[in-house]
């Protein structure tokens, strides 16, 4: 571990003897991951060379540097004869003692594992997708993580697990780049991509289920968190320290946090001495240490809260800590360490949070929210169930300061941490958002573990009460600071991510994209967060923003900022200390890891991966929850009091701002944990100090609980239930959550459940198809661009500052309502997969009351776990409903703040996790949950009621719950139908709830245009295909039927318009829209249906709030009647045309679908996602039934998507993988909700279109690996057919665009989406052109080889024999080209036939005749090919007589590659042609649309 995990060594490898070379490649540019060796055949040439290893990344072949294209590498390798010279890059991971007992054990059994052991550091130093090669990422502790978890929910193993869950267990035995090495995954580029993506994301502990990983993550917080200084002490103390920590921690914790901020002697001293890490220290330390460097820096400045605050908070903390320790008492060693570690590590925690956040973000990236959950849950469920759970609790369940070090130390590899810190810092930007979810995960689990810690010891609750009293007083005296502190303490004591998260959230806002998330996560886990929060509190809204920005910067490389900002509290020394502590903790990491991993392994063996994840954590939480429940009540009251009440206008504002912000971040990152822990911790911690702080983190949902005075009881009940929920059964989650939904305080529990469920769903989602994962990875890697996210985050930050006031009044009740709604069936369904949805709901809900508090969206994310549906509700809240801008900004924020999945209660979307996607990949997309945010829309009608009865959560929740339930069910079903999209996993999870979103959904959709847009962005392709088809019918039926019920809320009709109005923040305008829509609805269902179809068609693009929404809204209001009239007329015609086209396209797509299934969607599989983004516009343009049947058959339904939409989807799909990633991440983030503003249309058509796009593109996507298949004509033919289909559709698209786009004003969002899509397609085209150039070089090289062979033959052969050879080579070229040409023409004719109207008999006859002719010609060409093949044998026999073996091999290679290269060239040309046509269509549509706009 002395070598930096990030260091590489380049190894020259020379293989001789000709193909086969005995190794398999995976990854590549096509899959957005490094091109690595996934398998080495035993006894093969590669194995005999003894130089190549699994996981090695190819950087040079035969002197030709690789740009990462797998296709290029395959061509070069196939072009190599006799000798293959490679240069591979592998991580320098010196062999070092295993980081855990598991590793050691594995190594004992597997010598290979021992050799691989040097990789653990690599693995832990996972190279982030953003910054490192996935091959490096794959290097996670293979033996440990692989061995520890065979679950499919492992972060890295999500794909791998899918492919070979069994192998996941042995992956660790594979070489350092374990994931890349998976032989089973080798051929699945997607798998490689996904696994690699996951691996890099969670290199530390990619597999939540993996004991090692989880241990690393969860144990990380252990003493290993020496960087924090105190953690070491705590760690050293071990169990006794735990008890000690109980007492020490309160003051230490408090002081530690301030010390973190101030780098006080105590904290530093503790931090400085690397105490022998308690076992979890090793794992935690690796993570925490890695995180320590960053988080410490970020954390220490963060705690500039006055010493007074420290003291006052410390008293509270002591009470809380004793509670905590009481709870942890049972798990004294783990918990004690975790506590003390966290407590003392608070500054490190901040740092750690930075790095952890980066690390976790990496983990979360790959693992996603579920992964983090899994990780935590893994810890809990492992033999360390108690210790590990306690550890998780201590590290995760502990207050963030405790948790931060512990939770962040989960990864023991300190070297990894060092490199990770670097990587993390690099990735912080992109990973921060992701980090938050991991932290969230960790914290969720942390909270759960914390609760577990408290589970046996309800003393924490009583102390919490005391603390609450103290905290209330303190908060009143120093509310702002105390709140920050409280936030920090909440983070510390009860992983109140809100607080910690709130602080980082502020940071995150500064560095909106990843900083928001990372900051949230950092804050979640950094006691320092309290300091920064304190500072934020001190600074209040202005400082909050600044702190947010500063902390955001800190998160990544902003640690210096925070240092400067916090008065340089944190300095490089902290980081140095962090590194030193890391090393020391690494020394002790083995012990902790061994014990934790051993226990985890036992637990994992005893329990299923899911049950382990769920049960371990859940049971702990269950026990803890009840104890926490009473404090929860107190906490809720306090929180509500503190947030709602009086702490002081400024404190209140700050609290809200901080809480909202923290909540957005914290809930985003810690929503589940926070919900879980917060329910208990908040109950526990909130009673005194937490009221304001809890409000910070739990403000939204705590307020919601607050409205119900019985919240404590509910919390109790919920806690109890939640314990049950936390069992990982979606049903359990759903049921308790339903009850919890009704119960205010249970919301936190619900969130936990949601989180657990989400994690579960995440695990399921992790099993998403490789193509989906790959798409997600591409999105995350390509569209990881944090530019959009930062902006959104910034918005969130601002909004948060604004929204604290409204949140007080509206947000709380809304939260309750939303929470209830979310907890109900929707929660049940979405708890696993729908948690993100809830987050969205919650965000929206929060937004609703806080019209200008867009951060509520983030906040919603923060309190998302509790108020996922709540988010929806707050959005629905009258304010939000009409303050569409806020809600939109929230949704945008949420989408942008993707960092934690909007729907995943701040965690990375389980779906994303399941896909091993990065949060930046857009959880929204992951979850078609933004649609749920739409529940805000459909709650619009209820909105006023909700607003009016905001204090009556039951009322609002029920309607919204129904709405959410209704919408998600259908929505999810479509998603489920779209198995190809990355949404399939979570789609299924989400579709669990058979919500009939018909009536409520449409209104929701209207308001939730944002939500929908997010959702659409999430799985534009799937959604578009499915939603389009289903929405067209369902929307016409249900929306129009709803029209009567929604007449008052005609939003569905003009969901997007309505969204815009809302986005304009003009409730009146929105209402005017609503009235106008009602008028439209009243005009007639037919007209409405036409209008709806037209509008949805007309407003296909998700609409992120345009910059000038006011102007847009006014413009729309001015043109609304005219547009409606025109749309009514146009739509009637358009619908007729589209119906016909859809029928045709259905046939075509069915064909394409069949073909697609046969074809490997390599370029287009991920592109199909992109298509989704394009499709959303078209989908919106064309409403389709939302029936489950349609959704499930959305893939077929997508075929019914208008040709324009479909072709558009196809085109975009073709080149959309990057686009989708790009759109998904940026556009989705920038305009997630609006994207699906059409509501029903959005869902059904979104899924349909998305799916159709996916399918078509997958159809079109030629087998990327076809280059070496010279005679794969059938496959190519299928591809050609699909492409021809697409081309035909593209030809029709301009007309469609004129009808649809021309007929409807082109939304600003649509234009932006199209622009982004154009950019994405352009990037894809650039990659294809580059590949084409490389292919041309290969062709030239092969031609040169042919000339050489010809010269050699000419010298030795007879003239007539040489002439035979010459003719054969020429005929081979001609025949191959002829076959390709005829197959392509025939495919186009067939596509034309499929798309032709049944009435056009004459044209059909012509096409049939042409088809017959081409079929005959193709048969002749095949005969010619067979003849040429026979001649080839004869020529070979002749040539073999004259040429020596070497030259004969050259001849064989030349002949083989000649046809293969021709086919490959043709495929690339067609792909490029398709991309160019797509770009042309998009540009034309951009020109067409605005004219009518």
Swiss-Prot record:
Gene3D superfamilies: 2.30.42.10, 6.10.250.3120. Residues 234-243, 249-262, 513-547, 782-802 have a biased composition (Polar residues). One of its GO terms (molecular function) is actin filament binding. Residues 470-484, 498-509 have a biased composition (Basic and acidic residues). One of its GO terms (cellular component) is intracellular membrane-bounded organelle. Expressed in all fetal and adult tissues investigated. Expressed in adult heart, brain, placenta, lung, liver, skeletal muscle, kidney and pancreas. In brain regions detected in cerebellum, cerebral cortex, medulla, spinal cord, occipital pole, frontal lobe, temporal lobe and putamen. The expression is strongest in the medulla and weakest in the cerebral cortex. Residues 1213-1492 form the ASD2 domain. Probable regulator of cytoskeletal architecture that plays an important role in development. May regulate cellular and cytoskeletal architecture by modulating the spatial distribution of myosin II. Interacts directly with F-actin. This is Protein Shroom4. It comes from Homo sapiens.
